[in-house]
Each structure stands twice: as C-alpha cells, then as structure tokens.
C-alpha cells in the first residue's frame, strides 16, 4: 500500500511536469540543431544504429550493448540525409568495457568508452559534454535525444534526432515495474510516469543530460516503449567517472566499480 501511495504521488508530480514539456510522443520533438553538439551517431553496414556522447576531443561514451563490428562514428550530425559542413566521420581506435571485457549485464555495467582514431575539433555542430560533478537528484528534469524510433511497437525512423524532457525517478519505481531487478543497481530510473515520452529502439547509447552534464546512458526499457508506470533505465555515469578518467589518462587496466 505504501508503494502504491508513492506511485500515485509521483504520478501527480509527473503530470505537473508534463504540462511544461513538449508534445507527448516517443522521442519528443525534433531537436534544435544547436542543442546536440555532443550527440554522436554510431552505425554499421548492417543498419545497426546507436547514439553516443562526445566527452572530449577524442573520446566517446556509449552503451556496451551498442558495440558493433565495422562501427562508423559520425559527429556533428543533424539530418542524416543532409550532412552539415562540419560533420566528421571517425573510426574506433580502441574500445573499453568494464573489467576490460564485455562483462556487462542487462542490469549493470552497460557502458563503453571509445577512443577515436583521430581527434575532432570543436565547431559549430561539434562540442564535448561535461562528465557529471555530482549525481542527479530525484525529480531533476533531464533531456534525452537520438535518432531512434518515434513510434512503438511499430517503428518509425526519421532522419533528424528528436529530443524530450523526462524526470529522474526513485529506483523503487523501476523495481515496481520490473520486480526481478536487484535491490541496488548502478542505473538511473528516469521517465514520465503517465507514459508517452521515452527513449526507444535506436536511441541506445545516447545521453541523459541534466544541467548540462551527461548523467546517464540510454540502456534498456520496456516494449512497447513509453508505457505508463514503466520508465527507462540509464547507466549511472557518475558511478563510473573515476574509471572513465583513469582510462582517458592512460590507465587502460582500470576496472569498474563493483
């Protein structure tokens, strides 16, 4: 009963936030061309796509489950069919996973750090995003973005990224939706409780941005997407900042937190 009351109170709170947000469709509205300079498009010749985030001139952060063969990394992209003049393509020079392997699970350690084969310069449509200086608070309004499907369960992929606002929720909300989840996890629970806005297929690996910092990585969610009371799961970047900074500094044997 206590959990039901908590969910009911959170739903009222979410409804008040939703009135301030953009139209409730999966993926939100088309992103402003200048608001996603750190957003990266990962793609291969098998039409597998993911998002990522540029965190400095030669490093990209994404989800471990976004690893793919023949990965192509595009930066400064808005319209996939109409390249920007400063758009760049890079290849992965090295990829790093927790415990120096693909030893992640659906619930934990879904993080991949990619070193580019060549650095990129900051430009009109390319700029890195800061790592978090502190974890986000429950109730924080954060931004998701990506080229993923804007409908579910049927898929509709567009050439431009869509952006939307969602909220950081208490982890117990995600456990209520998925009782098999562990009692603790290095993931963030985020979404809109009444549904209608969500990251979805094709958005994996992209950022959850709160106060100008990357706080989460799109990891997994329910299908169909954007169901009421079934928020999404995001890798909690703050928990991995020491690992990320160690790898970038050259300590390639650094291990992730337990």
Curated annotation (Swiss-Prot):
Expressed by the venom gland. The lineage of its organism: Eukaryota, Metazoa, Chordata, Craniata, Vertebrata. Residues 25-249 form the Peptidase S1 domain. Glycans are attached at residues 44, 79, 103, 154, 170, 251. The keyword DNA damage does not apply. Keywords: Disulfide bond, Glycoprotein, Hemostasis impairing toxin, Hydrolase, Protease, Secreted, Serine protease, Signal, Toxin. InterPro entries: Peptidase_S1_PA, Peptidase_S1_PA_chymotrypsin, Peptidase_S1A, Trypsin_dom, TRYPSIN_HIS, TRYPSIN_SER. It is found in: Secreted. The active site is at 65 (charge relay system), 110 (charge relay system), 204 (charge relay system). Residues 19-24 form a propeptide. The keyword Zinc does not apply. It is an enzyme of class 3 (hydrolase). Residues 1-18 form the signal peptide. It comes from Macrovipera lebetinus. This is Serine protease VLSP-3. Its EC number is 3.4.21.-.
């Amino acid at each position: 009963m206590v959990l039901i009351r908590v969910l009911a109170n959170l739903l009222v709170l979410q409804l008040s936030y939703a009135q301030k947000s953009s139209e409730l469709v999966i993926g939100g509205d088309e992103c402003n061309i200048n608001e996603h300079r750190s957003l990266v498009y990962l793609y291969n010749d098998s039409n597998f796509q993911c998002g990522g985030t540029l965190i400095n001139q030669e490093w990209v952060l994404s989800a471990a489950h976004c690893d793919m063969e023949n990965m192509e990394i595009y930066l400064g992209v808005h319209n996939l069919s109409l390249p920007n003049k400063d758009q760049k393509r890079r290849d992965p020079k090295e990829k790093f996973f927790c415990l120096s392997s693909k030893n992640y699970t659906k619930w934990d350690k879904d993080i991949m750090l990619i070193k580019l084969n060549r650095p990129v310069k900051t430009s009109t449509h390319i700029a890195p995003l800061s790592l978090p200086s502190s974890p986000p608070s429950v109730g924080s309004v954060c931004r998701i973005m990506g080229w993923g499907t804007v409908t579910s369960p049927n898929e509709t992929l567009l050439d431009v990224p869509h952006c939307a606002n969602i909220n950081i929720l208490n982890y117990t909300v995600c456990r209520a939706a998925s009782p098999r989840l562990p009692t603790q996890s290095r993931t963030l629970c985020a979404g809109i409780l009444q549904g209608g806005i969500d990251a979805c297929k094709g958005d994996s690996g992209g950022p959850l941005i709160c106060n100008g910092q990357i706080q989460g990585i799109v990891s997994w969610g329910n299908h169909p997407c954007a169901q009421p009371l079934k928020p999404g799961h995001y890798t909690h970047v703050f928990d991995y900042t020491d690992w990320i900074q160690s790898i970038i500094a050259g300590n390639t044997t650094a291990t992730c937190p337990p």
